[in-house]
Every structure is written in C-alpha cells, then in structure tokens.
Amino acid sequence: MSTNSDLRVTLYTYFRSSCSARLRIALALRSISYTSVPINLLKGEQSSTKNTAVNPSATVPTLIIEHVDRSQSPITITQSLAALEYLDEAFPDNPNPLLPPISNPQQRALVRSLASIIACDIQPVTNLRILQRVAPFGVDRAAWSKDLIEAGFAAYEAIARDSAGVFSVGDTITMADVCLIPAVWGAERAGVNLGQYPTIKRVAEALEKENAVKEGHWRTQQDTPTEFRC
C-alpha cells in the first residue's frame, strides 16, 4: 500500500451522524489525515447531486481515497463498516489497528459482532431517515428511538460484560468501541439511562478521555453549529 503522504483522503460527513463519527474517530485513531466535506442532513444535502455523485444511497459517510499522482483510480466506500475494515487492511503500518490480529479469528468475530449490534440492530432503525418516515403514522419518535437503543444496548451489555477490559474487548480500542461511543452520544440525546448498562457506561467513560474520540466528537466538527460547540 502507498504511504499516507501519497494519498488524499476525503470524508463526506455530518457533525451529528453517528456513522460519520465512527470514521472520524477511526481516522484520528489510526493517524490518517483527511479533508472533511460537510453534508447537512437537515437541509437535505444528502440528496444533492454533489453527494449522490459519490454516494448513490444518498447517505453519509462517504470515504474517498485518491492517489496524489493519479496513478490509480480513486477508491470510494459508502458504508461505514466497510470503510473501517478498509482502513485496517489498507494501512497496516499505521498505529492502533481496529481489529485483533488475524491469528485470533475468535476475537475478530467478537469485535465484529459487537460493532454489528450498533451498526445493524440500532442505528438503521433510529436514524433521521427512518424517524421521518414513521412520523406520519403517529409514532412517538423519541420513544421509538429510546426503546430500540435500549434493546440494542441490552444485547451489547450482555456480551461486553464478559469481553471488556478497559474497552469493549480487552484493553485496546477496537472497531466495536469506534461504533459504540457515537451510539452512546445518541442514547444520551434520546434520554437513555446508561446506568442500566454498567459495562457500556464504564467503557464510554474511558473512551471519552481518548484524543481520537475528542477529535471525532460531534461537538468539535467544522460544521457543528456554534450553540452546540464545546
């Protein structure tokens, strides 16, 4: 793989998007410099030609890797979990891999399972696009989100209580943690009592101290409105 200096990394992102936050944290954790392209979901910019030209799903994030010398075609990844795995595989010499060593398939599967609870069971059914679609049916959007987050967190807690050290799987930050902490931010906004999930709460508190998490936090982005900034 080319060195980081040979590459131009671009992230299409929204400050409050948990999927975008996963990549912001991962890029910081792995010491990969990137340029942000803000996409305002509340203004519908995800459906703009600018965004759909790179992401036909009309979502964020989108990760684009370009060779500075244009010796190869750009790589465009439109799903956050795929992008996280790509960052692990394509930058093997960078610090802080997101998955355990390939020699430990059991631990790798565990990390992926925890990440998938967040990315597959919780996030898709509580994101803005779904909340907007269920609202006409009289659904209480806040209660909907809270119930589904709590169900997912209960599953995560049941697994992580046995696997956690300082973080979700042992004492090293993994892809599971990169997915968990943005979900915790969303849970707090939804009024979830994290005290019900002591392992998640403890791991989240440890993650909040990490510089990469601070850099990826929704309150610190270039498109974060002034009233929400730290």
Swiss-Prot record:
Binding site residues for glutathione: S17, S18, C19, S20, A21, R22, Q46, V60, Q79, S80, Q123, N127, L128, R129
InterPro entries noted in UniProt: Glutathione-S-Trfase_C-like, Glutathione-S-Trfase_C_sf, Glutathione_S-Trfase, Glutathione_S-Trfase_N, GST_Zeta, GST_Zeta_C, GST_Zeta_N, Thioredoxin-like_sf
Domain GST C-terminal: 104-226
Any one annotated GO CC term: mitochondrion
Domain GST N-terminal residue range list: 7-95
GO molecular function term, any single one: glutathione transferase activity
Pathway it works in: Amino-acid degradation; L-phenylalanine degradation; acetoacetate and fumarate from L-phenylalanine: step 5/6
Up-regulation conditions: Induced by phenylalanine or phenylacetate. Not induced by glucose.
Cofactor dependence: glutathione
A Gene Ontology BP annotation from the UniProt entry: L-phenylalanine catabolic process
Keywords: Cytoplasm, Isomerase, Phenylalanine catabolism, Tyrosine catabolism
Subcellular localization, as worded in the UniProt entry: Cytoplasm
Major subcellular site: cytoplasm
Family, as annotated: Belongs to the GST superfamily. Zeta family.
Name used for this protein in its record: Maleylacetoacetate isomerase
Organism per entry: Emericella nidulans (strain FGSC A4 / ATCC 38163 / CBS 112.46 / NRRL 194 / M139) (Aspergillus nidulans)
Source lineage: Eukaryota, Fungi, Dikarya, Ascomycota, Pezizomycotina
Name of the coding gene: maiA
